[in-house]
Design a protein with these regions (language model features):
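Repeat-based blade/solenoid architectures
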Residues: 5-35, 77-89, 125-136
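Short, solvent-exposed loop/turn segments at conserved positions within beta-propeller repeat blades
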Residues: 54-57, 107, 168-169
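Short, conserved, GDST-rich strand-edge loop motifs in beta-rich repeat architectures
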Residues: 152-169
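A short loop-to-beta-strand structural motif that recurs across blades of beta-propeller domains
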Residues: 60-62, 108-110
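Hydrophobic beta-strand segments that make up the repeating blades of beta-propeller
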Residues: 48-53, 99-105, 148-152
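Short loop/turn segments that connect beta-strands within beta-propeller blades
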Residues: 65-68, 114-118
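Beta-propeller fold detector
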Residues: 1-2, 71-76, 121-125
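Beta-propeller blade termini
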Residues: 33-43, 63, 84-95, 113, ...
Length: 169
């Protein structure tokens, strides 16, 4: 990553740099580390890396090149979200053979569909879930398709003792 601008201009600088330099209105959250997801996003049989970032810094999609170097394709792939992102999943949510992107942010859960060539389109923005952490995917109900489980920490209930219920999408 040494010759990659994402490394030298963002990752190498560390959290203290961003804590001092990001506008407070972005509410950068530096509690713990942010997530990472690894999968082949463009069908070249090389694993790529998605790095979640605190608010105000673009999330990064780093594409592995055949020569072992890495290129930042975040903007081209349309996944350079500036939202405070806590976790990511790269998993085939629509059963078309490629890896889609699911992101837990402090304000919403985002699901972006992959076109098979590493370009993503936002398909769902679930704002009513609040801030999510640690999403996982499995066929929980055994119906043949993947389901998402999104965990939340210290979230409010609806004041009647009920907690969030499933949200189909």
């Amino acid at each position: 990553l040494g010759k990659n601008a994402a490394w030298s201009e963002q990752l190498q600088l560390g959290m203290n740099t961003w804590r001092r330099n990001l506008d407070r209105s972005l509410s950068p959250d530096f509690l713990g580390y942010h997530g990472v997801a690894i999968a082949d996003v463009d069908g070249d049989d090389l694993e790529d890396v998605y790095l979640c970032q605190p608010g105000g810094l673009p999330n990064l999609l780093l594409k592995q090149q055949a020569d072992g170097t890495w290129g930042d394709i975040s903007k081209k792939a349309r996944v350079d979200w500036l939202d405070n992102t806590t976790a990511a999943l790269l998993v085939d949510l629509d059963n078309d053979g490629d890896k889609d992107l699911a992101l837990a942010t402090r304000t919403a859960f985002l699901i972006s569909e992959n076109n098979g060539k590493g370009r993503f389109s936002l398909r769902e923005r679930l704002s009513n879930l609040g801030s999510g952490y640690s999403p996982t995917a499995a066929d929980y109900d055994l119906d043949g398709d993947l389901d998402l489980l999104i965990l939340r920490y210290a979230s409010d209930n609806n004041k009647t003792g009920d907690f969030p219920t499933p949200h189909p999408f």
